[in-house]
UniProtKB/Swiss-Prot annotation:
<dbReference type="GO" id="GO:0048471">
    <property type="term" value="C:perinuclear region of cytoplasm"/>
</dbReference>
<feature type="compositionally biased region" description="Polar residues">
    <location>
        <begin position="673"/>
        <end position="701"/>
    </location>
</feature>
<dbReference type="GO" id="GO:0043066">
    <property type="term" value="P:negative regulation of apoptotic process"/>
</dbReference>
<keyword id="KW-0728">SH3 domain</keyword>
<dbReference type="InterPro" id="IPR036028">
    <property type="entry name" value="SH3-like_dom_sf"/>
</dbReference>
<dbReference type="InterPro" id="IPR004148">
    <property type="entry name" value="BAR_dom"/>
</dbReference>
<feature type="region of interest" description="Disordered">
    <location>
        <begin position="622"/>
        <end position="714"/>
    </location>
</feature>
<keyword id="KW-0963">Cytoplasm</keyword>
<feature type="compositionally biased region" description="Pro residues">
    <location>
        <begin position="702"/>
        <end position="714"/>
    </location>
</feature>
<dbReference type="GO" id="GO:0007165">
    <property type="term" value="P:signal transduction"/>
</dbReference>
<keyword id="KW-1003">Cell membrane</keyword>
<feature type="domain" description="SH3">
    <location>
        <begin position="728"/>
        <end position="786"/>
    </location>
</feature>
<dbReference type="Pfam" id="PF00620">
    <property type="entry name" value="RhoGAP"/>
</dbReference>
<comment type="function">
    <text>GTPase-activating protein that catalyzes the conversion of active GTP-bound Rho GTPases to their inactive GDP-bound form, thus suppressing various Rho GTPase-mediated cellular processes. Also converts Cdc42 to an inactive GDP-bound state. Essential for PTKB2 regulation of cytoskeletal organization via Rho family GTPases. Inhibits PAK2 proteolytic fragment PAK-2p34 kinase activity and changes its localization from the nucleus to the perinuclear region. Stabilizes PAK-2p34 thereby increasing stimulation of cell death.</text>
</comment>
<dbReference type="InterPro" id="IPR047225">
    <property type="entry name" value="PH_GRAF"/>
</dbReference>
<feature type="compositionally biased region" description="Basic residues">
    <location>
        <begin position="599"/>
        <end position="609"/>
    </location>
</feature>
<keyword id="KW-0597">Phosphoprotein</keyword>
């Protein structure tokens, strides 16, 4: 579990648990700051100390390996997992370079040191300043409240009103500062991943160019660099979308905090001052408590908490409420007081004081006091305003008209669906489309009056205006679960299953839309709208959450993944029935058991394989590599164009642990454990092929393990090699696990495939065989000899 999201609505409650979450975020940023300072120091050692370069590299590599990113929420995307694991990959590169060290030019100041210093000073330094302001304002706010609440009720009304106004102004200023600080904390937590990894990427690229035999090494690194750049760009794109949503939510809560409160199990909660009576002659004292009341059980909880004493929780007290009575002005010299009586202590009222008259009335209503206010203290989900759009025959007509116009006139327009139209024109077009008579007369395919971006914006606006998102509130959580876990194949199966649980009209409209988006993505070389970019645009549109919270916004990236899966697997999901044996959504989060890892990946003895096998980018066709973006002026920060990127890869999960098989590796971006053969040192190319870490694409995309998982030790006794004959000649074999080829020299196959003429390969851990007339390499532990 990562860091908990900081909800803006909690800024107004300022509960003890909210303060605990803030401290957790602050501690993580301080840890990041210390780490970056240490990393900068290590980088300077590399520049200035050529003679001690080997030691400095080891320290630098160790620092990279030990640091782990924290994340907000309960899961990460595949891109974030690869970014998290990238530091481990960089560490492996450094360790490998130590044995091949050559005299090289160390021009890393501009590419590494300055960006890190800039990030630490401008971003982390800004958070420190915000923290100082926040702590200072907290002290000032609660000191003023303490002082204000001691004012006698017998003072002149004008004096009291002036004091009330001053306190209220101070509280509003405190809330403003709290909102800004919470927003900044979460922004930095999300920003630091790509802001930190990008300078590292530049550093490695620059360093390799200065090696005597860096040409072959750079080929290996370039492939990983390309994948990581895509991961970073995807994460950045999602961050931009998430940031705009967070800012919008923050502004909504700032404008009307009471109406934006989240659903809660408590009818009322907040701070109250409780009068604690002492023996004569000491009188009484007022102690601040955080109080919670559940009306259904009539249970009242209160916990002493003082913001200025380190924020430590005191021993709480709970009792069942008997009654609540408003305290009259002549019975106490304090304002906003009322009495509550516990069921187990009859006749012994407890006097408490609210922060204001309004809060006292709210507490009295919630507790069943005499003065009731028609305003519930209980938090509730804020209903979304419903537009005129409906999922009816007219809605299907609007959808088909817009799609037909887009595919006829603008399928190759750059930034399709990301470049937004003029708001007034979009609203006018949508109004015309929703009028039956005008809709029939409107010809969008041949009309030059309506720009393509106006049509696409109207289509998106129609989908957003539906009373319920196309993928429904009911199934929203179920769609998110498989996007957070499981292998790509299990994700597709889960979403396939859930799509067929949608109401028939929803499924039909979703089918039409996704088919269109599939067509749009097929023209991505012209319009730059890859599947990932379309996911960013349509994720929030098709899967908006019922309750707007920071936690829901953090799930936006997983909504995007769901839409990507729909686009990539349109034919399977909408044209075939789901597997009848597939479990209910409650089981979707469980990952399937892994098959054993490939022997060759664990052993790392690849000297007999061609270099090209481990430099997959050598054989990429020109059209397969992502093209850089041409930036068009964006209409909004969220709709700016982004680098096209591939999405979820193959449908077969990586084999994992099975009985006496080898232990599974740490993950698709994790370590590649190598065993160095006892012979003369191999050439640079051979050595790189032995030690080259597995790139993200070289793993048949499977269940993404946690980046914190350490690889199991390689045990020779557990090797599958011991269970097979030393020499296999002219045998048959059956596949016991599915596999997708990583190179043209390897075979792809499904479970149950029969191989002919199977022989032992020159590479340990691999066999050679023939399948459907094609001969190639087979992972030894994926098959069973017949």
């Amino acid at each position: 579990m990562g860091l908990q999201p900081l909800e803006f609505s909690d800024c107004y409650l300022d509960s003890p648990w909210f303060r605990e979450r803030i401290r957790a975020h602050e501690a993580e940023l301080e840890r990041t700051n210390k780490f970056i300072k240490e990393l900068i120091k290590d980088g300077k050692n590399l520049i200035s100390a050529t003679k001690s370069l080997s030691a400095a590299q080891r320290k630098f590599a160790h620092s990279l390996r030990d640091f782990k990113f924290e994340f907000i929420g309960d899961a990460e995307t595949d891109d974030e997992r690869c970014i998290d694991a990238s530091l481990r990959e960089f560490s492996n590169f450094l360790k490998n370079l130590e044995e091949q060290r050559e005299i090289m030019a160390l021009s890393v100041t501009e590419t590494l040191i300055k960006p890190l210093e800039k990030f630490r000073k401008e971003q982390l330094g800004a958070v420190k300043e915000e923290k100082k302001k926040f702590d200072k304002e907290t002290e000032k706010n609660y000191s003023l409240i303490d002082k204000h609440l001691t004012l006698s009720a017998r003072k002149k009304d004008s004096h009291l009103q002036e004091a009330d106004l001053q306190v209220e102004q101070n509280r509003q200023h405190f809330y403003e500062l709290s909102l800004e600080y919470v927003c900044k904390l979460q922004e930095i937590q999300e920003r630091k991943k790509f802001e930190f990894v990008e300078p590292m990427l530049s550093f490695f690229q620059g360093m390799f160019t200065f090696y005597h035999q860096g040409h072959e090494l750079s080929k290996d690194f370039n492939h990983y660099k390309m994948e990581l750049q895509i991961n970073i760009q995807n994460t950045r794109n999602r961050f931009e979308g998430t940031r705009s949503e967070v800012e919008e939510l923050m502004n909504k809560i700032r404008q009307n905090p009471k109406d934006q409160k989240r659903a809660s199990q408590f009818t009322a909660e907040g701070y109250l001052y409780v009068q604690e009576k002492r023996p004569a002659p000491f009188g009484s004292s007022w102690v601040k408590h955080y109080c919670m009341y559940r009306k259904t059980a009539k249970k009242f909880n209160m916990i002493p908490f003082e913001h200025r004493s380190g924020g430590k929780l005191g021993d709480g007290e709970a009792f069942f409420l008997k009654e609540c009575t408003k305290r009259h002005m002549d019975s106490t010299d304090r304002r906003f007081c009322f009495d509550i009586e516990a069921a187990d202590r009859p006749g012994v009222p407890l006097t408490v004081q609210a922060f204001s008259e309004e809060e006292r009335k709210q507490w009295l209503e919630a507790l069943g006091g005499k003065e009731a206010l028609f305003h519930t203290f209980n938090r509730a989900i804020v209903p979304r305003p419903e537009g005129g759009a409906q999922l009816d025959k007219m809605g299907f007509t609007i959808l088909r008209k817009c799609i037909s116009a887009v595919e006829t006139r603008g399928i190759n327009d750059q930034g399709l669906y990301r470049v937004v139209g003029v708001s007034s024109k979009v609203q006018r077009l949508l109004s015309m489309l929703m009028d039956v008579k005008m809709c029939n007369e409107l010809d969008l395919e041949n009309s030059a009056d309506w720009e393509v971006k106006t049509v696409t914006s109207a289509l998106k606006q129609y989908l957003r205006s539906l009373p319920e998102p196309l993928m429904t509130y009911e199934l929203h959580r179920d769609f998110i679960v498989p996007a957070k876990s499981g292998s790509p194949e299990s994700r597709v199966n889960a979403i396939h299953f859930l799509v067929h649980k949608l109401p028939e009209k929803n499924k039909e409209m979703l089918d039409i839309l996704v088919k269109h988006l599939t067509n749009v993505s097929s023209h991505s070389k012209q319009n730059l709208m890859t599947v990932a970019n379309l996911g960013v645009v349509f994720g929030p549109t098709l899967m908006r959450p019922q309750e707007e919270t920071v936690a829901a916004i953090m799930d936006l990236k997983f909504q995007n993944i769901v839409v990507e899966i729909l686009i990539e697997n349109h034919e399977k999901i909408f044209r075939t029935s789901p597997d009848t044996t597939f479990a209910e959504p409650t089981c979707l989060s469980a990952s399937p058991p892994n098959a054993p890892p490939r022997q060759s990946k664990r052993q790392g003895q690849r000297t007999k394989r061609p270099v090209a096998v481990y430099n997959l980018c050598l054989e990429l066709e020109e059209g397969d590599s992502p093209s850089p973006l041409k930036e068009d002026p964006p209409s909004s920060s969220q709709d700016s164009l982004s680098t096209p990127s591939p999405t979820t890869s193959a449908a077969h999960g990586p084999p994992g642990l099975d009985g006496n098989h080898l232990a599974a590796d740490g993950g698709s971006c994790g370590d590649a454990t190598a065993t160095t053969p006892s012979q003369t040192r191999p050439s640079m190319v051979q050595w790189l092929n032995m030690q080259s870490p597995t790139t993200p694409s070289s793993n048949p995309a499977g269940t993404p393990p946690s980046p914190r998982m350490s690889p199991f030790p390689l045990s020779p006794a557990a090797s599958i090699v011991d269970k097979l004959p030393e020499c296999v000649i002219n045998r048959k074999a059956r596949a016991v696990y599915p596999c997708e080829a990583e190179h043209s020299s390897e075979l792809s196959f499904e479970i149950g495939a029969i191989f002919e003429d199977v022989q032992t390969s020159r590479e340990p851990g691999w066999l050679e065989g023939t399948l459907n007339g094609k001969r190639g390499l087979i992972p030894q532990n994926y098959v069973k000899l017949l």
